[in-house]
């Protein structure tokens, strides 16, 4: 790994008004927020700034990790995955639903591996960033599934790119 890599960890509330400022200058944004409204704000800011997004989420016994490059014409953004057909402000949060600590560890470790994959992008056999691929982790079964998300040409976040 490059010894010059740095991580800028943010413990700020992020919203549509400050997202662009908080992600400015990043090579990759890792989003671990706990609600759709914030995730969509982060995704939209990443698309606008041309920064890849690695999204990781946990709810109860399930998790998901996905790498999005909606700023590129051929790849989906996070909004392509979730769409706009729901009230992002009216969804449950981790605090309301609860999460299993072991799931957070599993998803966090998986996301760290995906972040390395994105940052190495082609520099090694490990470097396929897997843009638009969503990995679902199920702690009850336990098993994983993966599928690719297509870019939505009508997406409000990246469709015009």
Residue ranges of predicted features:
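Adenine nucleotide-associated cytosolic modules
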Residues: 1-161
